[in-house]
């Protein structure tokens, strides 16, 4: 059997969900198909040669170990180390600067700028959201007024309009193939998720970002919000270690995803 090094931070305290529960379940299913090693993301550099494939899963925000992660990526690419996800993503894997690029290119994304001189691009709004470029789990996110922004312009951060939306919805992909969708029908409870049946228009929206990212292999979560007019706007494109919320799925859909995940990992160890 091929050997996997499965990276996770079992002690990370995430908002609204338990990373360790998901990874304990997933690894319990993988162990019958692979020789399985479990490691912490900040120990991977000394273990690059111990597995056929390194699986990057619920490892917490990279912002806490950014320099180490960058060294890992550079070393893995230099040595041709096989990873899942592949390290060629252009979205959250590299921070949130891509939101600026998508805005400039006219994609259906929450409009994003980084300079107060460009606030006009965000339209008329009374409040703004300021985000860290390397943030995750809403860490460092602030809601501020226009006056507050102008008085203390943020440095090396992102600025977005505070949108009033109906709900958030996420589309989950494995090797560019759609798997399932979940939404939070009550925006005040963003982690109270339920299965969602996407329309053809919904999937066309999400597929466009998959095509833009053009990542070779892995799990990608397309997070979006539904505006009052029914349109969708991208919130973020999580292409490094998206939480899967498997516990929300029906037993049949969860089993289907796990089997496809196993097959994708097996393929990645030999391709």
PLM features: what roles do these ranges have?
Residues 226-271:
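C-terminal active-site "lid" helix and adjoining low-complexity regulatory extension at the edge
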Residues 51-56, 131, 171-173, 180, ...:
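A short beta-strand motif that forms the metal-chelation/ATP-contact edge
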Residues 83-84, 110, 129, 158, ...:
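Structural detector of well-ordered beta-strand residues that form the stable sheet scaffold
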Residues 106-128:
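Rossmann-like NAD(P)H-binding beta-loop-alpha module
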Residues 10-111:
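Conserved N-proximal alpha/beta basic substrate-recognition cap immediately N-terminal to
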Residues 137-233:
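Phosphate-binding site of ATP-dependent enzymes
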Residues 43-50, 74, 119-125, 148-150:
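Short amphipathic alpha-helix with an adjacent loop that forms part of the alpha/beta core around
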Residues 1-6:
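Extreme N-terminal starter segment of soluble prokaryotic enzymes
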């Amino acid at each position: 059997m091929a050997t996997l090094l499965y990276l996770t931070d079992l002690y990370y305290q995430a908002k609204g969900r338990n990373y360790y529960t998901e990874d304990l379940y997933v690894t319990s299913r993988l162990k019958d198909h692979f020789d399985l090693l479990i490691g912490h993301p900040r120990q991977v550099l000394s273990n690059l040669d111990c597995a056929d494939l390194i699986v990057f899963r619920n490892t917490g925000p990279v912002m806490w170990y950014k320099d180490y992660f960058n060294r890992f990526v550079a070393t893995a690419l230099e040595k041709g180390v096989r990873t899942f996800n592949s390290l060629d993503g252009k979205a959250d894997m590299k921070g949130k600067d891509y939101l600026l690029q998508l805005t400039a290119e006219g994609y259906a994304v929450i409009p994003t700028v980084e300079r107060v001189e460009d606030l006009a691009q965000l339209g008329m709004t009374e409040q703004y959201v300021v985000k860290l470029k390397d943030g995750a789990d809403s860490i460092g996110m602030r809601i501020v007024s226009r006056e507050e922004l102008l008085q203390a312009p943020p440095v090396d951060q992102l600025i977005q309009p505070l949108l009033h939306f109906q709900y958030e919805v996420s589309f989950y992909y494995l090797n560019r193939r759609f798997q399932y969708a979940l939404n939070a029908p009550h925006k005040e409870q963003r982690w109270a998720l339920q299965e969602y049946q996407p329309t053809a228009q919904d999937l066309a929206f999400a597929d466009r970002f998959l095509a833009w990212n053009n990542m070779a292999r892995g799990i990608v979560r397309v997070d979006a919000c539904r505006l009052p007019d029914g349109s969708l706007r991208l919130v973020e494109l999580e292409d490094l270690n998206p939480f899967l919320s498997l516990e929300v799925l029906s037993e049949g859909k969860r089993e289907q995803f796990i089997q496809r995940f196993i097959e994708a990992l097996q393929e990645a160890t030999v391709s």
